[in-house]
Amino acid sequence: MNGAPIKVLLQTTIRATVDDWSIARFSLLGQFLRDRQKENGAAMFEVTMRDRETRGSPDSVLAALDESGFDEMWLFAVDVGDGLTAADCAGISRFRRRGGGLLVTRDHMDLGSSICDLGGIGEAHHFHSRNQNPDVSQRAVDDPFTTSISWPNFHSGANGDFQEIRAIAPIHPVLRDPQSPSGALRFLPCHPHEGDVDAPSNQDARVIAAGTSKVTGRSFNIAVAFEPNAEAGPAIAQSTFHHFADYNWDLGRGCPSFVSERPGNAMAREPRALIDTQRYVLNVARWLARRA
């Protein structure tokens, strides 16, 4: 791959906070991307990691994202519903309309629901109180253990464990793995209460990966891909930011004090799980920049 490095923004929807899911808790993701090199030894990615500046007023970067030099943004919606202002959403939407790539991810119930106001990709994210899934059968509690969290809360497993995912045919470029017998990636980190994503019927989007609840056996969507076109850049809607968090890659990195669920350790015992996760990250980062 030739040319300048792909400029990636890793961004949360909260201010820098020690005891929360601020950008410091995605350091392994950032370092992995920074360490990728082209065949000539040059950096493949130029990575910027940041939290939002203030709460309740437009962020100087997000509100003018379309005027930035970034090729793509990974947005971790870790807020309780107020993480993006109208000006932020407008700037992000303009960024995608001018061809920028977006990965937008959230978590259970209403965590990250400020992304509902993003043009196009916001429609892929269903929450408890906003943009509810039109399929009423999906509005049901899946994880019964953390009773303070209601639907959507798909239980793919414990933090620290991994899940086997299903690539939906045809295999999307972000899920391809030439070393896999099936040609597709198999593993991603688990989380006890993942969010709900689906493909809006009025857009060029489709579900590309699904998982299975370890509690109910229900299938749930993990990722939705929006193909680039003349009106918008490529995008991925992801069911939970925990697929990319330090804690879910390496338990030793710790988590905020409010995380109460007992973790597993399968990620540490099965190297292939992290290899697949990092391959997914690399595939997504290249696809969002249209370099896949």
Give residue ranges: language-model regions.
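Catalytic beta-strand/loop cores that center a nucleophilic Ser/Cys/Thr
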Residues: 133-239
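A solvent-exposed, charged loop/short amphipathic helix patch at secondary-structure junctions
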Residues: 246-274
